[in-house]
Regions:
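Sec-dependent signal peptide recognition
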Residues: 22-31
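Hydrophobic h-region of N-terminal signal peptides that target proteins for export
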Residues: 31-39
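N-terminal catalytic scaffold of extracellular/periplasmic and nuclease hydrolases
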Residues: 41-226, 230-231, 307
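Generic beta-strand/beta-sheet core signal
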Residues: 50-51, 147, 187-188, 235-238, ...
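Active-site His/acidic residue clusters
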Residues: 155-161, 239-253, 268, 276-310
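Phosphate/oxyanion-binding active-site loops and adjacent basic polyanion-contact surfaces
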Residues: 166, 256-265, 304-308
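Active-site regions of oxyanion-processing enzymes, predominantly non-cytosolic
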Residues: 218, 222-236, 264-287
């Protein structure tokens, strides 16, 4: 991944990778859908990295079977990413466990390195830092966005910018988000915006603003602020936070003015496209497929898969 080799080598391919299975049907698995939009000479300019957390083969097949049933027929109705020309399966054990978790799995997705369960952006020795594909893209002059339907400091998005030994170090992860300096972040909110022991009297919102980030609350607020913003942090509204700050609502429970993964993706593409850079890298996580499966809620899981596919 040194120099510009990464962007040249992928060329015009599209990839879908089924990854990160957990025990039984309550798997923490991710299907990686990386779509590359290329320039005439074959060098990737726009890289989209879609991760469905908890989305293994069963979740994909179950959703496609459900979609066919809704259409009144037996069989399957293919999801968009399932029709990509290249599909692969990989083993998902972490550096120290047969069953991975979101932190180790996310680090593998973001950096290509296996690590200890719970660790983010560091090797199994819990000391050696490893940089992500997002950091590489930033170092090569690309605009970078990291987005999710859960909190911005959750394990999968944090794998792309943080370097901590414990995924529960949410305040430190938030500080790493700021230090990474990516152009666009989006999710429900921070889980631990305040920690006087680490940050004095400054919460993460204050630190973000001091680092040059504009904070938008909801898609309508983003549209008002985007043009004048240098860097953007898109979060859900304060009203939505009172109900649940850990994530945006499930697709099956969505209300009219709720922030959606489509809103987040649309805003990210818009914001990154207006940056004066040679293309961009964007990671989008559908983070609640896994949560629905932990609750044994098939209907909600299928709706979350469809929502990410949209």
């Amino acid at each position: 991944w040194t120099s510009n080799r990464f962007f040249r080598n992928f060329g015009s391919s599209t990839i879908s990778i089924d990854i990160i299975m957990r025990r039984r049907l309550l798997s923490l698995c991710a299907v990686l859908c990386m779509a590359l939009v290329v320039m005439a000479e074959g060098k990737a300019k726009y890289v989209f990295y879609f991760i469905g957390d908890g989305m293994g083969v069963n979740q994909v097949n179950g959703t496609e079977t459900y979609m066919a049933a809704v259409e009144g027929r037996i069989g399957t109705s293919p999801l968009c990413f399932a029709q990509f020309p290249y599909v692969g399966l990989v083993t998902t054990y972490s550096g120290t466990n047969g069953v991975t978790d979101s932190a180790a799995g996310g680090t593998a997705l973001a950096t290509g390195n296996k690590t200890k369960n719970g660790a983010l952006g560091i090797k199994s020795d819990l000391t050696t830092r490893i940089n992500s594909i997002a950091a590489l893209a930033k170092s090569e002059g690309k605009a970078v966005g990291v987005t999710t339907s859960v909190s911005v400091d959750h394990a999968t998005p944090a794998s792309f910018y943080a370097h901590v030994k414990d995924r529960n170090m949410y305040h430190q992860i938030g500080k790493d988000l700021i230090a990474a300096g990516f152009d666009f972040y989006a999710g429900s909110d921070f889980l631990q915006p305040e920690n006087n022991e680490l940050s004095g009297n400054k919460d993460l919102y204050t630190q973000c603003r001091e680092a040059g980030y504009t904070i938008a609350r909801g898609y309508a607020d983003y549209r008002k602020k985007a043009k004048k913003a240098d860097k953007m942090l898109l979060l859900q509204t304060e009203t939505a936070n009172k109900a649940d700050r850990t994530s945006i609502p499930y697709a099956i429970d969505r209300q009219k003015n709720d922030l959606t993964l489509q809103d987040i993706t649309r805003a990210a593409i818009h914001f990154l496209s207006q940056k004066d850079t040679d293309g961009f890298f964007l990671m989008v996580e559908g983070g609640k497929i896994d949560w629905a499966c932990h609750s044994n809620d098939a209907a909600t899981a299928f709706k979350e898969v469809i929502d990410m596919d949209n």
